[in-house]
Amino acid sequence: MILVLGVFKIEVEPMLKEMEVLEKGRLLKRYYQRGVVGRNEVVVSYGFIGKVEAALVTQAFLDRFNIDAVFLTGNAGGLEGVEVGDVVIGDSYVEYDFETALGDEGIIVSGSEDLEDKVIAYSNREIKTGLIASGDAFVTVKEKAEEIKRRTGALCVDMDSAAVAKVCYENEKKFLAIKTIVDICGRETEEEFRKNYERYGFLSNLILLDVLKKCVF
C-alpha cells in the first residue's frame, strides 16, 4: 500500500478526485481516503504544517495501515539553480535548522532510488533531482536562502520533507518527496507566491497520479 501526503488539500486534490474510493475516514482529525489508482492501493491524506506535525501524521498512518512506500507531494521555495514551475524530486533530505556537533551539513537522510527511478521513467515531465532542505520557517530573506544553499547545496526548501524522510527511515519504509517550485526564496512577493500556488499547487500530485496509473509500486 502507498501513502500519499500533502500539506494542504490542493496538494493531493487530483488523486482524491480520481481514485476509486474504498474507504473514507479520519486519523488524528485528518481526513483520509483509501482507494485504488491504477493497480496500486493508496491512502491519501493532508493537513499539517511544520516538521513536528508532518512526522506525527506520517507515523500515525504507518501505524494504522500496512504501508510500503510514502510519497509527499506539494510545493517548495526555490534556491539557486531552479525556477518557478520546476519540479524537484528529493534524492536526499536535511533539516537546515537542526544544529549538531557534526558540522554544518547536518544529518542527511537518503531517499528511495527505486521510487525516484520509477517516477522519472514514467513521468512525461522534466524533473530535477537533488537535496531538499526542511525547516520550521518560511525563508523570505535572500541572505538566509544563500546561507542554506551554501551549507547544504539544496535545490529547494520546505517545512516537511526531511521530517517525513526521517520517520520513513526509522520505519524502514521507502520515501520520495515530489515538490513544485512556487516561489524563489528572497525574490518573490506574497502576491506572486499566491498566484504561483494557485497555478502549480496541484502539479506534483498530478504527476504522481499519472505515474501510478502506469506503474505498480
From Swiss-Prot:
Belongs to the PNP/UDP phosphorylase family. MtnN subfamily. The gene is mtnN. It comes from Thermotoga maritima (strain ATCC 43589 / DSM 3109 / JCM 10099 / NBRC 100826 / MSB8). The active site is at residues 11, 183. InterPro entries: MTA_SAH_Nsdase, Nucleoside_phosphorylase_d, Nucleoside_phosphorylase_sf. It is an enzyme of class 3 (hydrolase). Keywords: Amino-acid biosynthesis, Hydrolase, Methionine biosynthesis. Its EC number is 3.2.2.9. Pathway: Amino-acid biosynthesis; L-methionine biosynthesis via salvage pathway; S-methyl-5-thio-alpha-D-ribose 1-phosphate from S-methyl-5'-thioadenosine (hydrolase route): step 1/2. Catalyzes the irreversible cleavage of the glycosidic bond in both 5'-methylthioadenosine (MTA) and S-adenosylhomocysteine (SAH/AdoHcy) to adenine and the corresponding thioribose, 5'-methylthioribose and S-ribosylhomocysteine, respectively. Also cleaves 5'-deoxyadenosine, a toxic by-product of radical S-adenosylmethionine (SAM) enzymes, into 5-deoxyribose and adenine. GO terms for biological process: L-methionine salvage from methylthioadenosine; L-methionine salvage from S-adenosylmethionine; nucleoside catabolic process. It comes from the Bacteria. GO terms for molecular function: adenosylhomocysteine nucleosidase activity; methylthioadenosine nucleosidase activity. The keyword Transit peptide does not apply. One of its GO terms (cellular component) is cytosol. The keyword Zinc does not apply. This is 5'-methylthioadenosine/S-adenosylhomocysteine nucleosidase. Substrate binds at residues 77, 139, 159-160.
